[in-house]
């Protein structure tokens, strides 16, 4: 019988997620494969979530831990909006997430997160968090999961400061394609979102396929 800790360790082996900060917003992207050891447990795993009108999050690690946290954050964002009439800022959401993770540091939620959002006053924001609540505010890009070393190679080569979302989407897709080609624990398609002054936009499979064709055509 597999223990809880062993179960979590199995699920931490897979995934590639990336986030890029652009001049006019943020781009988030993930693969769709969930693994349990060497088994592909799910080919349509959801790893990209809308938290609020202007905030989205990617997950890597234990699916159950991450989903529980997402439910909490979504509820808190709704309560905040009901009380204040305003959307929670990306920094506020990240701080809340950090506090929850740190509060569970003795029995940590085994997940690594990227939070992207658009602050109507301060513009696009991108953060990464470790399982015990450590926050890094990113000024360019970040990646998590087993495919991240390969993704970082593409991001380092392709990313330039002050790129727009249109270019950022293509870079994110290229990074995911490269990671899925090299990492056995990543694959089965891409999930993609942008966050700008109009809010969170989740891309359809057809829209993503068109971006994939643009990227592969350039090779």
From Swiss-Prot:
Active site: 15
EC number: 3.4.25.1
UniProt xrefs under InterPro entries: Ntn_hydrolases_N, Pept_T1A_Psome_bsu_arc, Pept_T1A_subB, Proteasome_bsu_CS, Proteasome_sua/b, Proteasome_suB-type
Localization of this protein: Cytoplasm
Single GO MF descriptor: threonine-type endopeptidase activity
Cross-referenced PROSITE patterns: PROTEASOME_BETA_1, PROTEASOME_BETA_2
Keywords: Autocatalytic cleavage, Cytoplasm, Hydrolase, Protease, Proteasome, Threonine protease, Zymogen
Lineage top rank: taxon: Archaea
Subunit text: The 20S proteasome core is composed of 14 alpha and 14 beta subunits that assemble into four stacked heptameric rings, resulting in a barrel-shaped structure. The two inner rings, each composed of seven catalytic beta subunits, are sandwiched by two outer rings, each composed of seven alpha subunits. The catalytic chamber with the active sites is on the inside of the barrel. Has a gated structure, the ends of the cylinder being occluded by the N-termini of the alpha-subunits. Is capped at one or both ends by the proteasome regulatory ATPase, PAN.
Known function: Component of the proteasome core, a large protease complex with broad specificity involved in protein degradation.
Family per record: Belongs to the peptidase T1B family.
Name recorded for this polypeptide: Proteasome subunit beta
Species: Methanococcus vannielii (strain ATCC 35089 / DSM 1224 / JCM 13029 / OCM 148 / SB)
Classification of source organism: Archaea, Methanobacteriati, Methanobacteriota, Methanomada group, Methanococci
């Amino acid at each position: 019988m597999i223990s809880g800790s062993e179960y979590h360790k199995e699920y931490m082996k897979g995934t590639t997620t990336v986030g890029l900060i652009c001049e006019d917003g943020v781009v988030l992207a993930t693969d769709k494969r969930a693994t349990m050891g060497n088994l592909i447990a799910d080919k349509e795993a959801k790893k990209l979530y809308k938290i609020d009108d202007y905030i989205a999050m990617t997950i890597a690690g234990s699916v159950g831990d991450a989903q529980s946290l997402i439910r909490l954050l979504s509820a808190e964002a709704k309560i905040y909006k009901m009380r204040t009439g305003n959307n929670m800022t990306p920094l506020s959401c990240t701080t809340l997430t950090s506090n929850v993770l740190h509060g569970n540091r003795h029995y940590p939620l085994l997940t690594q997160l990227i939070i992207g959002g658009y602050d109507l006053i301060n513009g696009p924001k991108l953060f990464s968090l470790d399982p015990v609540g450590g926050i890094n505010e990113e000024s360019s890009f970040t990646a998590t999961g087993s495919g991240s070393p390969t993704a970082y190679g593409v991001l380092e080569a392709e990313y330039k400061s002050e790129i727009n979302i249109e270019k950022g989407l293509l870079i994110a897709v290229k990074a995911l394609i490269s990671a899925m080609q090299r990492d056995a624990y990543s694959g089965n398609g891409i999930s993609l979102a942008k966050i700008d002054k109009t809010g969170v936009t989740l891309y359809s499979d057809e829209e993503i396929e068109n971006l994939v064709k643009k990227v592969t055509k350039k090779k």
